[in-house]
């Protein structure tokens, strides 16, 4: 009898959430597994009068352990002509607390702003990310906006762009920005809203038990014509929404193997950006069970169009003459289900080159950190976001217990970045890596800070408008003393952790995706 083998290089991954399915290309090295938890009993007694000492062991299966999975994806933003999205955004949304996906109104999200002419000439040159909550806002309804303001070498603020558009704003409303947020100097800045979005977007949001403390309202991911800002404002809860993952091995077109990871929880995402690579995210998490859908008879593989294919709820249809197009029956009938969204999957224009990545490190505490702003050219880095999930498994005797659900622990945002050891020959406090080390280790200054307060932004892929890129903005960051690494070129590695001043809010960081807006590289969604 012939035996069918399956190869990892023939594999694809699909994610099911809220009656919709997305295709997510993964890299080599993905894994998923599930084992059992066992206990053993051993005998250990002394020798009897007959010279016999009983020795033995008995094993018991206590429970089925939760499934563990991991895979890597590239960071792949794209632009649909009206909205910015990312191939992997479904994973972020579930990790960040969303429980719904659909078309929602994006009215009031800021599309464009104008910066009133700045008369100051004494601001510190640099790029500053400003949260609207730290400004004086002329309106009352808007929330969640973030801007990036640039100060030129003349000490004048001369450029602004929207990082996060927020919600419920109105054109002509203003923000008065304190000088301390834009390099100090003379006078405040005024930012005026030019236009706001009036349409609708395919968004991920929180529907049940919305956390009113979130600065971003119910929205977790709100794509607009400007960008796609993803926040964790709805993630302050003990149990997050889950999704189903499908690993499809297409080695055989007649008998493709499909493993379903039920009730999967996204635990950790680690973003890596080394100088010679493509921006990558390493994902890991848990699931309740791993089910073989092929052996269960729930995989239909043929050339029939899904709209004409009959099936029952939960069955999977793979169209063999259309690159094994994945469809899922959400109810029993003919064509009663959804076909996987594959927007951006086939594009070659949405990969991000790490070599263009920039880091902006700044603080308003110039008494302790004399440079205030540090301009660091990176050679690599990492940001890791973790929900620290543990899976609950009962421990009843006499039963093989089954995993119940994952429970979150403390949310952590940590990472590191590396750069060459550089000294600005023009003098001290010029924002070089040497200045950062000296400021952090100087007694009576940075060394005396139990908790230091930096704002850190990684511009992965650079800052050129229209190019694919990902910004990671962390408003409050505690930075460790840089560690020297002695190699051919001396470098320093700096660890950090983002934190919040208000434990009622999940505001440690915001991710902002920008797709390639070149007309030829736009793709439809969904």
Task: Describe every region a protein language model picked out.
Residues 108-202:
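Conserved, function-critical positions that sit in or immediately flank catalytic
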Residues 1-109, 199-526:
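Signature of extracytoplasmic/envelope-associated structural regions
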């Amino acid at each position: 009898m012939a035996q069918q083998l399956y190869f990892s290089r023939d594999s694809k991954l699909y994610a099911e959430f809220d009656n919709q399915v997305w295709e997510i290309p993964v890299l080599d090295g993905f894994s998923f597994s599930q084992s059992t938890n066992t206990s053993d009993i051993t005998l250990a007694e002394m020798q009897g009068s007959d010279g016999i000492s009983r020795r033995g062991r008995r094993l018991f299966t206590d429970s089925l352990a939760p499934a563990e999975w991991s895979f890597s994806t590239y960071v792949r933003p794209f632009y649909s002509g009206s909205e910015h999205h990312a191939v992997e955004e479904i994973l972020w949304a579930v990790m960040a607390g969303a429980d719904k996906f659909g078309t929602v109104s994006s009215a009031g999200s800021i599309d464009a702003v104008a910066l009133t002419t700045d008369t100051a000439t004494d601001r510190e040159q640099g790029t500053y990310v400003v949260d609207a909550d730290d400004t004086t806002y002329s309106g009352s309804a808007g929330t969640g906006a973030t801007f990036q303001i640039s100060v030129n070498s003349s000490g004048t603020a001369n450029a602004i762009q929207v990082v996060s558009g927020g919600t419920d704003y109105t054109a002509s409303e203003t923000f008065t920005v304190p000088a301390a947020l834009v390099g100090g100097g003379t006078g405040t800045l005024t930012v005026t809203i030019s236009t706001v979005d009036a349409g609708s977007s395919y968004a991920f949001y929180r529907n049940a038990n919305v956390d009113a403390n979130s600065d971003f309202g119910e929205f977790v991911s709100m794509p607009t014509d400007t960008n796609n800002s993803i926040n964790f404002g709805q993630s302050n809860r003990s149990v997050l929404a889950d999704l189903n993952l499908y690993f499809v091995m297409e080695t055989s077109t007649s008998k493709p193997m499909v493993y379903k990871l039920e009730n999967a929880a996204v635990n950790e995402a680690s973003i890596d950006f080394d100088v010679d690579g493509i921006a990558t995210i390493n994902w890991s998490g848990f699931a309740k069970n791993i089910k073989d859908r092929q052996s269960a008879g729930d995989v239909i593989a043929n050339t029939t169009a899904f709209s004409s294919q009959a099936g029952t709820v939960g069955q999977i249809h793979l169209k063999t003459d259309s690159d094994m197009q994945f469809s899922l029956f959400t109810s029993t009938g003919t064509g009663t289900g959804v076909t996987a969204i594959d927007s951006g999957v086939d594009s070659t224009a949405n990969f991000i080159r790490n070599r263009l990545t920039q880091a902006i490190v700044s603080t308003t505490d110039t008494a302790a950190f004399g440079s205030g702003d540090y301009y660091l050219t990176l050679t690599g880095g990492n940001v890791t976001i973790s929900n620290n999930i543990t899976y609950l498994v009962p421990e009843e005797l006499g039963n093989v217990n089954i995993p119940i659900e994952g429970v979150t622990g403390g949310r952590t945002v940590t990472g590191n970045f590396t750069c060459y050891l550089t000294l600005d020959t023009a003098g001290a406090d010029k924002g070089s890596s040497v200045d950062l080390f000296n400021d952090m280790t100087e007694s009576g200054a940075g060394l005396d800070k139990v908790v230091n307060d930096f704002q850190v932004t990684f511009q992965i892929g650079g800052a050129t408008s229209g190019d694919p890129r990902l910004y990671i903005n962390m408003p409050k960051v505690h930075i460790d003393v840089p560690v020297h690494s002695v190699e051919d070129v001396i470098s320093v590695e700096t660890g950090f952790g983002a934190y919040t001043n208000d434990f009622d809010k999940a505001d440690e960081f915001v991710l902002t995706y920008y797709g390639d807006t070149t007309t030829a590289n736009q793709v439809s969604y969904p």
